[in-house]
């Protein structure tokens, strides 16, 4: 049985969902120390001007090393409104935005207290829309020793790291993108880029992203 360990992630990239599809068991880390500038609170979409990072503000923890499970979402800067406007602006001309938008909009209207809960519920929705059924559990403690069948992707899947180097089993697959004529194909964006552009065919693309499927 193949087991993957992942960090919590906000509208995670295609690489992340490739693991959800291709591993038999997924553990989402709850006890790692929270770090900004990671997919824990950041997602990358494609707009008219190219890649655009969306970051969720968080409440500064009292302790310098705060477990991810205790990180609270801040209401600073009207971020929900800004994120939804950015998503709408980037994807309202895609083939499937109108079809899926009412599934996503409520996440930007409801206030969630904890970042992990917000990320988890969004992930559950995306899995349902793509039609994958990963076996996911939250970790009960921070794991440092891994069996041969367990792979640690908690820091490997990172917006500042080159997936070609850190994750050779991930093979990005080109698909239709609205702004491709301007910027060329942009690989490994947020899963919503794939979903809004490809709709039900997202699963077919995702199935090809694992080296084992080549």
Over which residues does each language-model region extend?
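Residues lining hydrophobic/aromatic ligand-binding pockets adjacent to catalytic sites
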Residues: 1-214
């Amino acid at each position: 049985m193949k087991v993957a360990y992942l960090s919590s992630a906000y509208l995670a990239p295609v690489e992340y969902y490739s693991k959800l599809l291709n591993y038999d068991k997924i553990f989402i880390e709850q006890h790692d120390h929270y770090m900004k500038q990671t997919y824990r609170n950041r997602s990358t979409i494609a707009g008219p001007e190219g890649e655009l990072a969306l970051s969720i503000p968080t409440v500064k923890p009292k302790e310098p090393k705060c477990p991810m499970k205790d990180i609270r979402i801040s209401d600073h800067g009207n971020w929900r409104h800004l994120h939804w406007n950015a998503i709408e602006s980037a994807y309202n001309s895609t083939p499937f935005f109108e079809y899926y938008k009412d599934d996503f909009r409520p996440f930007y209207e409801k206030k969630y207290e904890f970042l992990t809960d917000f990320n988890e519920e969004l992930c559950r929705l995306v899995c349902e829309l793509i039609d994958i059924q990963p076996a996911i559990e939250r970790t009960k403690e921070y794991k440092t020793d891994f069996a041969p069948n367990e792979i640690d992707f908690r820091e490997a899947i990172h917006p500042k790291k080159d997936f070609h180097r850190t994750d050779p089993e991930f093979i990005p697959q080109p698909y239709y993108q609205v702004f491709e004529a301007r910027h060329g194909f942009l690989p490994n964006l947020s899963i919503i880029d794939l979903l809004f552009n490809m709709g039900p065919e997202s699963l077919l693309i995702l199935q090809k992203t694992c080296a084992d499927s080549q």
